[in-house]
Amino acid sequence: MSEAEARPSNFIRQIIDKDLADGKHTTVHTRFPPEPNGYLHIGHAKSICLNFGIAQDYQGQCNLRFDDTNPEKENLEYVESIKKDVTWLGFDWSGEVCYSSDYFDKLYEYAIELIQKGLAYVDELTPEQIREYRGTLTEPGKHSPYRDRSVEENLALFEKMRAGEFAEGQACLRAKIDMASSFIVMRDPVLYRVRFAEHHQTGDKWCIYPMYDFTHCISDALEGITHSICTLEFQDNRRLYDWVLDNITIPCHPRQYEFSRLNLEYTVMSKRKLNQLVTEKLVTGWDDPRMPTISGLRRRGFTPSAIREFCKRIGVTKQENMIEYSALESCIRDDLNENAPRAMAVLDPVKLVIENFAAGTVETLTLANHPNKPEMGDREVPFTRELWIEREDFREEANKKYKRLVLGKEVRLRGAYVIKAERIEKDEQGNITTIFCSYDPETLGKNPADGRKVKGVIHWVSAEKGVPAEFRLYERLFTVPNPGAADNFAETINPESLVKVQGYVEPSLVEAKPEFGYQFERMGYFCADNKDSSPQALVFNRTVGLRDSFAKIDEE
């Protein structure tokens, strides 16, 4: 990453500092291990920033490892999208991309070792019976009738599993630990199951696949990971993580540390719920700009630096909490306010005619791209007799608090002249169709010579030179702060989470690059859509408003 960011402090970094000071480790090696069965979301970004950020700050290494032990739900599309997202966020992994499937041969050998030590057995209970025998939080489990098979018998049966002689669900390999443990994860967990599925990396070489808890710790150890960082739901699994490594012949024994996952208001993070949104066509896809996926946020106009800043601000703790959506919006708003060039766009246009400006004349005005950054340069904007302004920027009559255009009153056009509304035309329904004005030609870049005060400023686009555009006005996807807690979360979808309107932009925006953010003056921050926008048919997505539109709602 290019910018120098202050090193954050949290309990995990304090552990690392102590490990280095005590000589427990001489270097730091972390990993980010997603399963390639879906698209990354903002919650994954927290883990990415933590793991890659630690490696970066301690001059260590961070592996990108795909936890690919479930071939039926995984594919290369997800592998490529995850690599793209990590790179886009500004991080590079150490060496080649790793896959848990790289270690399938070693994992099989370690399973054999556990069998030889009498610590694993082939069970022929059905999956339903295994669940039944496991017990509950208040009742201990009971032993499988196959638990006391001999080592020789288990070795032979495990080889038959590998040879494809058992059907799916007919046999599995289980660890022999403690069926009375207060931790259900330690009640003889399944280590291998039969799956006749082709794998995106290993093809049809295997018909048995290792479970996550068996694979994860061994993969960490084989890669020399020093600090295995995961979210709190794996806290109990740490006991199995340590048990596996304690009972196999492997030189490295990483330690697992847990932190709270990201819970964000007005959205859902569950892969199942996100998939439901897509499959039921409640959104347009995984990269819908209303989705919390990295690809959705990117399409909406979020920047990598804003997402990294968000992850930095929320911090890393063991405390579960719900983060306000406005915290995420604040990060992108701050980023774009600092870095986005300004431009003018009219989203709800009404025509304005300057009667004392010569017809057919085009005056080229020079406007700054950023009010506080002269190094960002200027742009040329055409000014003509007929303009578009926002419908809400005109009233026939108004009180003194209204600082925009009023019939018989004056206002300044952004970067241009002072105008006065003289008269209007309406259609048969009483809607204003045209506002006729006069302009003061001596007010370009200066106040009226006679000293009269003109306080209001409104934006505009040339009606003759402006370019038509579609604007997609995105809001929060749900109407309640915690939609995941609803009986039917889909019923809490915000019907106004996407509103499409037609308007006009200044001609310089014809060449707007997808995902590149602009501040449309007085309207918000927008970017050209990375799928649907073209110079022939411009489409702009609203990234975020100039201020929090939900603040007042939340207070009520």
Swiss-Prot record:
Signal peptide: none annotated. SUPFAM superfamilies: Nucleotidylyl transferase (SSF52374), Ribosomal protein L25-like (SSF50715). Monomer. Keywords: Aminoacyl-tRNA synthetase, ATP-binding, Cytoplasm, Ligase, Nucleotide-binding, Protein biosynthesis. It is an enzyme of class 6 (ligase). GO terms for molecular function: ATP binding; glutamine-tRNA ligase activity. It is found in: Cytoplasm. It holds the Pfam family tRNA-synt_1c_C. Belongs to the class-I aminoacyl-tRNA synthetase family. This is Glutamine--tRNA ligase. ATP binds at residues 35-37, 41-47, 231, 261-262, 269-271. It catalyses: tRNA(Gln) + L-glutamine + ATP = L-glutaminyl-tRNA(Gln) + AMP + diphosphate. One of its GO terms (cellular component) is cytosol. A motif ('KMSKS' region) lies at residues 268-272. NCBIfam families: glnS, PRK14703.1. Its EC number is 6.1.1.18. A motif ('HIGH' region) lies at residues 34-44. The lineage of its organism: Bacteria, Pseudomonadati, Pseudomonadota, Gammaproteobacteria, Vibrionales. Its main location: cytoplasm. L-glutamine binds at residues 67, 212. One of its GO terms (biological process) is glutamyl-tRNA aminoacylation.
